């Protein structure tokens, strides 16, 4: 394998009457009686069953191809008109909500429910309209709070979304390629994952490092995730699976979990950065959840300060290319409606099988839609922002952009080409990559480093309180950061 080339390995998903009997109907009467009604009076001894079909009951000729195409085009046009009307009804409802007109919003919502019947559920706008109509209903008529989705349920839906479409695979591949290139020539490397989930991203990186000319480095992974409500150390479970893989490909490996309800609870000392190791931070669809209303102090600042203080070799950031952090409800609703319509269209095209897998992937997206539509203030977490705004924010935090090379662009296009659907495209913009659908960017990937020195090895890192990188101090009890549910150290796995 060529140096710094990431392998494609993803271990771990109407002639209706034509059938009538020709002797079934008698011929019509030749003479009409005075009452104006035609009667048939067969001659004596005539075999009624042997009579030929009357001319008017002959089989209809099949539709000409041009006529069938015209009918299909007319139906599509009718559905398109119905879809446009439904979109206008949903936007009118959102506008009435923003204006505080509950009665008008309720009437528009009722019309939206009725209009859904005229839109095909197989179309992107038809499926997404169901979710937005449901979300508007929940906002207008709040019901008793349902139990929140458990982490296990979220992980289940996340896995189906991963399998159904190219977006998360694109995110993992692009980030891993940048990390692999940043670690070139480094003997001790440390990846800090802001959202470990099931660890789906890391088997491919471990395999790529195993194939590195000159031998693999010593790899540490610190995985951050929420505390388990059952008390089971799920982070450690993921670490054990990764350790088994690393052992099988002869990569020296250490894993450590850090449990935190929010990323701003994590402090640099909890990461146990070791002197001399090259550090990479990785964030896939996480940073937008740290944003807040303009009047509030957002947790994003503390997290970016933490990243900058460590001075990493690379900081990979994948985010939705959307603007769902607007203060005006109608603007936010409109942007989300068209964004998710494109995502649903692409999801349908990417998955040839459809079925339950697609339904679970859509359920994953439905949670985001409900948060954007129903949530306000601190209750709203899905605050997606476009790449241009992330550039400004990350630059202010003391980070510099690292261009994603032509190699990453070429291989990302190859990866996306493995999925069905010709509408997907990967484009490069100012050193960043975007994955879009029919020309609309939907996800962006960028890479960053500490400004000034381009990042580097942590030879004199003042935030580290541990020398070495064995990660063998399992079950340490980390200090709370002043919150009642502060971050804590998790178990470690070492090879």
From Swiss-Prot:
Induction: Induced by treatment with gibberellin (GA3). A motif (LXXLL motif) lies at residues 287-291. GO terms for cellular component: nucleus. Keywords: Gibberellin signaling pathway, Nucleus, Repressor, Transcription, Transcription regulation. Residues 279-371 are annotated as: PFYRE. Expressed in elongating internodes and flowers. Expressed in floral meristem, stamen primordia and tapetum in developing anthers. Expressed at low levels in roots, shoot apices and rachis. Residues 77-449 form the GRAS domain. The keyword Nucleotidyltransferase does not apply. GO terms for biological process: gibberellic acid mediated signaling pathway; regulation of DNA-templated transcription. PROSITE patterns: GRAS. Belongs to the GRAS family. This is Protein SLENDER RICE1-LIKE 1. It comes from Oryza sativa subsp. japonica (Rice). The lineage of its organism: Eukaryota, Viridiplantae, Streptophyta, Embryophyta, Tracheophyta. The gene is SLRL1.
């Amino acid at each position: 394998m060529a140096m710094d080339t990431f392998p494609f390995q993803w271990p771990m998903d109407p002639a209706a009457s034509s059938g009538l009997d020709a002797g079934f109907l008698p011929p019509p009467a030749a003479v009409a009686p005075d009452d104006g009604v035609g009667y048939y009076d067969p001659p004596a001894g005539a075999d009624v069953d042997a009579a030929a079909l009357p001319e008017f009951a002959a089989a209809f000729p099949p539709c000409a191809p041009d006529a069938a195409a015209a009918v299909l085009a007319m139906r599509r046009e009718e559905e398109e008109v119905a879809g446009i009307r439904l979109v206008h009804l949903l936007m009118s409802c959102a506008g009435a909500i923003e204006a505080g007109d509950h009665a008008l919003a309720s009437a528009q919502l009722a019309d939206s429910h009725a209009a859904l019947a005229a839109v095909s559920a197989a179309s992107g706008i038809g499926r997404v309209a169901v979710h937005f109509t449901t979300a508007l209903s929940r906002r207008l008529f709040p019901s008793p709070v349902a139990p929140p989705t458990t982490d296990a349920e979220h992980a289940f839906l996340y896995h189906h979304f991963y399998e159904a479409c190219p977006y998360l695979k694109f995110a993992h591949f692009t980030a891993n390629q940048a990390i692999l290139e940043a670690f070139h020539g480094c003997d001790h490397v440390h990846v800090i994952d802001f959202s470990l989930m099931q660890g789906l991203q890391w088997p491919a990186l471990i395999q790529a490092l195993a194939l590195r000319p000159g031998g693999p480095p010593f790899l540490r992974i610190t995985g951050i995730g929420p505390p388990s409500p059952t008390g089971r150390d799920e982070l450690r479970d993921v670490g054990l699976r990764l350790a088994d893989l690393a052992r099988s490909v002869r990569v020296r490996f250490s894993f450590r979990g850090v449990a935190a309800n929010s990323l701003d609870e994590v402090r640099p000392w909890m990461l146990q950065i070791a002197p001399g190791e090259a550090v990479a931070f990785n964030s896939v669809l996480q940073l937008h959840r740290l944003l807040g209303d303009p009047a509030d102090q957002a947790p994003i600042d503390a997290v970016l300060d933490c990243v900058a203080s460590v001075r990493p070799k690379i900081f990979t950031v994948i985010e939705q290319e959307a603007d769902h952090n607007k203060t005006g409800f109608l603007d936010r609703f409109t942007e989300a409606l068209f964004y998710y319509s494109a995502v649903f269209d692409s999801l349908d095209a990417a998955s040839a099988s459809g079925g339950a897998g697609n339904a679970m992937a859509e359920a994953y997206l439905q949670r985001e839609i409900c948060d954007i539509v129903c949530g306000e203030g601190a209750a709203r977490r899905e605050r997606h922002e476009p790449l241009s705004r992330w550039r400004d924010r990350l630059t202010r935090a003391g980070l510099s952009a690292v261009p994603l090379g032509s190699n990453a662009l070429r291989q990302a296009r190859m990866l996306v080409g493995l999925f069905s659907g010709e509408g997907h495209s990967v484009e490069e913009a100012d050193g960043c990559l975007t994955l879009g659908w029919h020309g609309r960017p939907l996800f962006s990937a960028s890479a960053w480093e500490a400004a000034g020195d381009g990042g580097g090895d942590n030879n004199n890192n003042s935030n580290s309180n541990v020398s070495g990188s064995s990660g063998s101090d399992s079950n340490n009890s980390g200090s709370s950061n002043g919150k009642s549910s502060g971050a804590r150290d998790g178990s470690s796995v070492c090879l």
